[in-house]
């Protein structure tokens, strides 16, 4: 009976971890490396308005996802209030979320607006940042994206 209880605890623990990981991947734009923002520093986006690649020497983990920073100072800033530095829409392309789909981003294509940052897809066919910026009704754009994100992040 004790062995059965041990097995049940193990199965529940592993099952919970797998479900948590799957939910994290669905709501956050990460690959199998589990590194957010393709290694770019979330603090650089918000505090400096720059896309800067971080370093694994300055790594912090928040909710099971690793974030890289350019310095120990940036890492300390992040660790004081990590939620502040989370990208909108889990780091997926903001215009894609507006359109109802999740797309990986080009970490150099971003917009900082009202204390938040939005990341965008950029490829040969689509410059999603340009499409986002061309929209006159930003409030409608964000409302629609917010509504779509509630469905897409589940």
Question: Which residue ranges define each predicted feature?
Answer:
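Mature extracytoplasmic domains of secretory-pathway proteins
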Residues: 69-70, 74-87, 91
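Residue-identity detector for threonine
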Residues: 6, 13-16, 61, 70, ...
């Amino acid at each position: 009976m004790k062995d059965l209880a041990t097995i049940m605890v193990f199965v529940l623990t592993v099952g919970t971890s797998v479900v948590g990981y799957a939910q994290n991947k669905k709501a956050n734009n990460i690959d199998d490396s589990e590194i957010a923002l393709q290694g770019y520093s979330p603090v650089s986006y918000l505090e400096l308005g720059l896309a800067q690649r971080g370093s694994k020497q300055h790594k912090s983990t928040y909710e099971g996802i690793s974030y890289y920073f350019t310095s120990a100072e940036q890492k300390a800033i992040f660790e004081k209030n990590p939620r502040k530095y989370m990208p909108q829409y889990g780091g997926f392309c903001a215009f894609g979320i507006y359109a109802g789909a999740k797309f990986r981003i080009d970490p150099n294509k971003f917009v900082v607006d009202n204390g938040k940052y939005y990341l965008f897809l950029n490829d040969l066919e689509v410059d999603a940042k340009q499409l986002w910026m061309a929209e006159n009704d930003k409030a409608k754009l964000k409302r629609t994206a917010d509504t779509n994100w509630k469905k897409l992040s589940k």
